[in-house]
Amino acid sequence: LLLATFGFGAIGFIDDFRKLILKRSLGLTAKQKIILQVALSFLIAILCFIFQNDTITKLWIPFTDIRLNVSILGIPIMMFIMIGTSNAVNLTDGLDGLSTQVSIPVFLTFIILSQNIEDELFASIMLGSVLGFLFYNSNPASVFMGDTGSMAIGGAVVGLAINMGITLFLIILGGVYVAEALSVIIQVASY
């Protein structure tokens, strides 16, 4: 959970650092960012496979009692979900307060659905963080999240979903993230 949050946040920090401090307009290239994300998500998926086997190998189908056994295929599936979620949250951070406003119901839902105190506490901390940040990030924004914050939030969202065993529920729970990511993909593909 912490590895996902801080790991994806670190990737965002490197990107922001290269943009702001080193004055490189692009920051990390898309290829560099994807390589770092693949490496991090592979590490997290392997650790989950070793220590929390059921959260990786058995995918819960939302609103059913069905747990689909995907065995070793859980690793690439989780990698795809981690990379997709962190990038979708990052893409949502375009307008003042949008990413934080979208994250509020997501973290509230995690608090409600959590089965253990650690997940509930972490989701509560993240909820408090985005609520506090929203005050400064609402229109007109005086503080911006950048890739550091948006990638860290994406890592926290996907980390909680994996830890709680509800990764496929992210498609519904993070509907705005999914819609934003699909919108960007369609726009890039059509131009």
Predicted regions and their residues:
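Alpha-helical transmembrane segments
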Residues: 1-13, 44, 49-50, 73-191
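Cytosolic, membrane-interface loops and tails of multi-pass inner-membrane proteins
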Residues: 14-29, 185-191
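Membrane-interface helix termini and inter-helical loops of multi-pass transporters
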Residues: 20-21, 53-66
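Juxtamembrane helix-entry segments on the extracytoplasmic side of multipass membrane proteins
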Residues: 67-73
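Pore- or pathway-lining transmembrane helices of multi-pass membrane proteins that form conduits
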Residues: 28-42
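Membrane-interface starts of transmembrane alpha-helices
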Residues: 29-32, 70, 146
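Short, Lys/Arg-rich N-terminal segment immediately upstream of the first membrane anchor
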Residues: 24-28, 65-66, 172
